[in-house]
Amino acid sequence: LIKKFRIHKDQKRAQTKKELFKEYLPSHSKIIDIGTGSGQFSLVLKENGHQVTSVDIKDKTNTNLITPTVYNGEKLPYNNNSFDISMLITVLHHCPNPENVFQEAARVSKNRIFVLEDVYSNLVMKYLTWWMDSLMNLEFFGHPHTNKSEAEWENLFKENHLRLIHKKKVKVLGIFTQVVYVLEKVNP
């Protein structure tokens, strides 16, 4: 029963996430979904006509229709500019070195990088965000909690020669904030 509930919840979240990016997602895009997790977001993208490559540091999918490439979390096993779009959907704060994962996403993307991240605006919200993330992911030990503020994420994007073309704040459970970022490569 709990497993069915989690799958249903993941399916609903995947549909919601697709809606956040659909305006900037050309049809039939070649996409890499980095940190695919349950696989439901990759599945929604595939069902909408995109060519999706799913990668993660371990296979945590809850669907037989998605099989991620398991990689070391440091270097993606793809050439430069292999994908139209790299997607990092609520994954960077799970990484011990989010800057490296982000740079790899930019390296393998021809043009766009989509990011959805939990952000905080003060110390209380930082710790509440950490607690809620641990609870939602059932990860209470070994979670790096490398969340950043909006300004810190946006500084990382600039340092990597990316232009912010769309930003939208989304409230979660009324008090938490996620930010949608659509980024494009620019010449350094």
Label each region the model flagged.
Residues D10-H28:
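Conserved alpha-helix/loop element of class I SAM-dependent methyltransferases that forms part
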Residues K169-P188:
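Core SAM-dependent methyltransferase catalytic element
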